[in-house]
Every structure is written in structure tokens, then in C-alpha cells.
Amino acid sequence: MRKKALIFTVIFGIIFLAVLLVSASIYKSAMAQKEEGHEAAAAEAKKETDLAHVDQVETFVGKEKYYVVKGTDKKGTALYVWVPADKKAKILSKEAKEGISEDKAAKIIKDEGLVSKQKEVHLAREGNVLLWEVTYLDKEGQYSLSYVDFTTGKILKNITP
């Protein structure tokens, strides 16, 4: 009886270890894809704009894929640079003070009475329109998002799947 329990424990341990290793491999692969292109986008942003120091790079995928590079110029002015994955599209750059802040975008959506619980706020872009993408749970608990114009603060689109 002890021998069967030992065999069962060893087999279970091997299966558990295999599942753990496969899961770790999948996670590592997914995270690598998430950050793929970030270094090239940061280099391109530095080359094509006044950006001197990169603080953060995020990927935005809407109608097109963009990398949003946040950083500062040589004077310490906060800059946002939208680098398209498609090299034919134009790189756009704005000083942070030229648009509304992340907090202001979130407040605009909250003031509309749409938000039950705010999730995230990220810079986004649709064509040449610069946006804040605000994700949240609405009053019915559905995961929703709204696009707020970076420059004007106007809500351009609300999406609830």
C-alpha cells in the first residue's frame, strides 16, 4: 500500500511540475509579446522628437497599433510621443501640458455618472486624434471604456461590449 502511495505521489509531483513549467513558459512568452517593440519605439521617439529621457512605453491597439512613449525633453518638460507600428503613419508628439491630464480624463468620465469602479487610464490614438482611454466597470458591472479627446477633454466614444 505504501508503495502505491509513493508511486502516486511521484507521478502527481511530476505532472504538477510539468504543468508549472509549461505555465511559466506561456507567461514568459506572453509578457515578451506585450513588450515587443518597446525599445525600438523609444529609440524612434528619441530620434524623431525632442524626447531625451524615456520613463515608460505602453502598447495601444485600436484600429492601428501604436506605442505611447512617456518621458521628458532636455529641459525636463513632460512629453508624450505616439509611435505607430506601421512606419508609414506619422509620429505625433505633445507636451503633457498641451492636453488634459490622466486624472482629468478619469474625472470627466466619472462626472458623466458612468463609472462604478475605475480600472485604468492610458494614452491612445485613433488616426491623428490623440486620446485618453478610460476603462471602468459601469453601473451594471460591465467592463466598459470611453475615449476622451486629449486636447479638448470631450468624450468621443463610450463602448460597453
From Swiss-Prot:
SUPFAM superfamilies: Cystatin/monellin (SSF54403)
Gene3D superfamilies for this protein: 3.10.450.40
Topology relative to the membrane: Single-pass membrane protein
Stretches in topological domain Cytoplasmic: 1-5
Membrane-spanning parts: 6-26
GO BP term, pick one: regulation of cell shape
GO CC entries: plasma membrane
Keywords associated with the record: Cell membrane, Cell shape, Membrane, Transmembrane, Transmembrane helix
Localization in the cell: Cell membrane
Keyword Cell inner membrane attached: no
Recorded phenotype for the gene knockout or disruption: Cells lacking this gene are deformed, being shorter and wider than wild-type cells. Disruption of the gene can suppress the tetracycline sensitivity of the ezrA mutant.
Highest taxon of the lineage: Bacteria
InterPro entries associated with the record: Cystatin_sf, PepSY, regulator_TseB, TseB-like_dom
Extracellular topological domain: 27-161
NCBIfam families: regulator_TseB
Task of the protein: Required for normal cell shape. Plays an important role in cell wall elongation during exponential phase and spore outgrowth. Probably regulates the activity of the penicillin-binding protein PBP2A through a direct interaction. Not required for PBP2A activity, stability and localization.
Quaternary state and interactors: Interacts with the penicillin-binding protein PBP2A, a monofunctional transpeptidase.
Name under which the protein is recorded: Probable cell wall elongation regulator TseB
Organism from which the protein derives: Bacillus subtilis (strain 168)
Annotated gene: tseB
